Amino acid sequence: MADSLITLMIDGVPVSVAPGTLVIEAAKQAGVLVPHYCYHPGLPVAGVCRMCLVEIEKAPKLQIACATAVTEGMVVKTQSAPAKDARKSVLEFLLINHPLDCPICDQAGEGELQDFVFQEGRSGTRYGEYAKRFNPVEDFGPDVLYVPNRCILCTRCVRFMDDVAQEPVLNVSERGDRAFIGIHPEARLDHPWAGNVVDLCPVGSLLSKDFLHKARAWELDKTASICTGCSQGCSITLDTRDEVVVRVRPRPNLDVNRYFICDHGRANYRWMNRGDRIEAPLVKRDGELHATDWDEAFARVLGILRGASGKAVALVSAGASVEALSLAKRLLSTFQWTGAFQVVMGEEAPLAGVPNLALRAERAPNAKGAEQLGYTRDYAAAVKAAESAAVVLVLDDPDCPVQTAGALIYAGTVLPPETACRAAQVVLPIANVAEEEGTFVNRDGRAQQYFQAKPAPGMARPAAWVLGELAAALGVAEVA
């Protein structure tokens, strides 16, 4: 493998990369970030912004790092005087028309133009305010606004819709200093993956209506997580402000979702902030549920489990973590247990330009993990079996239509409706996916970890902690 690598020097640092690697990517391995706007590793190369100009020894002129492949023995200088002067000039041209509205721009603190102006740009401009443009904001789609005054025509959005989404509704209209991003007059940016143009935009020209004016970038806490919208298992970042999830963004994962997420997953966070959460354990007294502490709730559950025998049924959510599902199985291991999960189905929406990436019809982030642990998809049969079971455990499935002659234990984030699990003897408050650490297994069998982004409300705890404490107190051994 090492024999097939190409070795070059970038700012005096030797780097070995695979043949065909672009200079801009090789520079990253040397710890050098070459400024760029039009280039994105998930899009076809355009080479239109000219911001990534570097000096290459023996080349007759400066080269763009985003479209130049490495060669053996190449010597690249990203910080030479000619390269830096050229990038300063490019930035000066880009800023001729760009408005100075960083204080009101939603992308302030995250804008690549802002970053590279500080890193590479001149301290002043030779052009007056007369050069600024004043064009109205356009409504491109259900969640996308276009602010043409900020656009630098990097064409990332056009290339995404053309080559990745393969729905060519955007274009560069007009020419020269009158050019702007246009949309087909009869089209809307309503493709199931259209929200990615907002993530791709380096200057705050394309904005999400959902996130508009919600927070500044420096106010956000960012946490690595896994999307719960379907069984694809896309890597995401949860952005929280004051312990409230305000935005979901894609996190690069070349094996699962590359650099993108669908709009369904992007909007799949509001339930994480629900205000009707269960904040304390509840136990049934005189036919009514009453708040209590964990000690009494655990004592009630342990009394039920120790006093029962025969069949037990676990009706679980396919959004529960591997850890929680494993501990639920362990907790019921002394019974003849049956476990099942329900899968909500929806419409599948593939991203045409990326193989094996789609919003899956199966809206179940951990269905594969549940199956690997012995839970089945025959939910109706399990609900039927629950009617005669000694113990029924419902895990985060508030709409479960269970009726049982035995004892019902419900662990969930919200209270079930009157027609579902209100017959429970004990209700255990648990954290949702944004409030715990855990593991999901996606449809391809890939186990992926997610992390806690905010605290759980009140006395709610992660399901794995609750079930683990009960299993330990019951003295049941781990099960395979």
Name the predicted role of every residue range:
Residues 307-308, 331, 335-480:
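Non-catalytic alpha/beta scaffold blocks inside enzyme catalytic domains
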